[in-house]
Design a protein with these regions (language model features):
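Charged, low-complexity, helix/coiled-coil-prone segments
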Residues: 4-14, 89-101, 128-135
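Membrane-inserting effector segments that mediate pore formation, membrane fusion
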Residues: 4-67
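Flexible interhelical turns and helix-capping residues at alpha-helix boundaries
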Residues: 35, 54, 76, 145-148
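Eukaryotic partner-binding/assembly regions in large regulatory complexes
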Residues: 44-121
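Long, helix-rich, hydrophobic modules that act as membrane-proximal anchors or helical bundle/coiled-coil regulators
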Residues: 103, 107, 111-149
Length: 149
């Protein structure tokens, strides 16, 4: 799956700090026109589809992805690579990190929920929680009312 590989590539790059824009104050059009997003593997893959299809759903998904990725910018790139590679190389998990994150982020209600999920993914990356705990927390967040945050 090309999209999940693009997400993993984005997570393993150092440019996540460039995504730290105030998503709440920026419209979807402004997000997609930003050159930084075009240079990020995952968003450039989606952006190509948006241009071809013009899908609002894809644009909203991109906004959730940008919100998720921008939350991870403080985690050192080597730490991100190490954790993702260890999960991907484990026999315990059948779905690679990138693909699983696509499923999780796609199900997120909005970009704010995606940001909350990213906070817990950060905890996974620094070793504060396990991958299974992250997956359980993500499922709980998915079923919560956004006003509960």
């Amino acid at each position: 799956m090309k999209l999940s590989k693009s997400l993993e590539d984005s997570l393993k790059k150092d440019e996540l700090s460039n995504l730290a824009v105030n998503i709440g104050e920026v419209g979807i059009d402004a997000i997609l026109d930003n050159g930084v997003l075009r240079d990020t593997p995952i968003t450039s893959s989606i952006f190509g589809g948006i241009n071809a299809i013009g899908s609002v759903r894809d644009a909203l998904f991109t906004k959730k992805l940008v919100s998720f990725l921008s939350e991870l910018s403080d985690i050192p790139v080597e730490q991100r690579r190490s954790m993702i590679d260890s999960i991907d190389n484990s026999d315990d998990y059948k779905v690679k990190v990138g693909e699983k994150l696509i499923y999780i982020i796609e199900k997120a209600e909005d970009h704010y929920t995606s940001k909350v999920i990213a906070i817990f993914f950060s905890e996974l990356l620094v070793g504060e929680i396990t991958y299974n705990q992250f997956l359980k927390i993500s499922r709980i967040i998915d079923s919560m009312f956004i006003g509960d945050f």
